[in-house]
Amino acid sequence: MAENLTKWGHPHTFVTQAFPDAFTSLEDTFDIIATDVPCSGEGMFRKDEQAREEWSPAAVISCAERQRDILTAVWPALKEGGFCVYSTCTFNREENEDLVIWACTTLGAELVEIPTDAAWHISGDTTGRNLPVYHFFPHRTEGEGLFLALLRKKTQDVGESLLGGDTFLSSKWEKTQGSRAAKGKKRGNTPSAKPNATLLSWLHNAEDFIFQCSEAGVWTAVPTAFVGIREQLAQVAPLLIGGIEIAEEKGKKLVPQHALAISISASDSAFPRVEISRELALAYLHREAITLPLEAPRGYVVLTYRGIALGFANNLGNRANNLYPNEWRLRNL
């Protein structure tokens, strides 16, 4: 996810890595939460032999319990009136229809109907209750199988029943929720720092950011409008992305970072842009050694293909250092 969102190039994105209960304390924070929950994987049976071998009725029960735990953990962080997308890649009612009914009776959620077209061949409730839920079966739609329901947080006390029935909280959640919260270490933020003119010139809208420099000398630009939510997230979970990583200090030099090259906030005039061929672009993305055209400027340049920024290279003349992230390189051409 961190790689994909960095490639997207939008500065207003943060990526964390934590258990769901890390977010319980962020009450009424998010407008939308998407929960692509772990499941028994019946939608993977056609293409994954291991998924078939690992399936059992006990696995379905265990997955449903985990799904309830996840929704219970993140529900307080959803704003009143906010939406929660619940999805699985399985077919059974225990993890799908029964689970969202549980969310309504226990969490005070309500199911929201999503407009669809009959031409899409999406199937509805399989339990005869006419619930506004959506099955994407592999014999009717493209893909291996998907279930989706849209939940809305009612503006009333959690636990009030909308569909009738008793409230439920799994014993597993009761045992682990408190212990994880107690053991969780608060993570502070890197203090804001004053960037020099060079750093400021690398963003076309630098006045919309604050700048932070880590102990390792990595400079990050954080959109001013999102500093508050970034600080909240950093207090409960490690941040894999917390803004645009724009430069790393190496001695007295500033080495531009890959995220800057592909950010929509990067200044087009900060670094020369060199358009390259398809063959050279593939070699670059494969992180091979490359040589740029003789007329290419020396130093750090942004390589582009069909006008789209691919990343940085340091052009030395007789060769160019390929600065594409090693962990992102194309494995197969």
Region spans (language model):
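Mobile active-site "lid"/loop adjacent to the S-adenosyl-L-methionine
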Residues: D31-T72, C89-N96, A118-H121
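Polybasic, low-complexity RNA-engagement segments
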Residues: E144, K154-L333
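Class I S-adenosyl-L-methionine
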Residues: E113-T141
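Residue-level signal for inorganic ion chemistry
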Residues: M1, I33, G82, A103, ...
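Conserved Class I S-adenosyl-L-methionine
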Residues: E97-A119
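S-adenosyl-L-methionine
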Residues: M1-D28, T35
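Helix-to-beta-strand junctions that scaffold the AdoMet/dcAdoMet cofactor pocket
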Residues: L78-E80
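Conserved beta-strand signature within the Rossmann-like core of class I S-adenosyl-L-methionine
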Residues: F83-T88
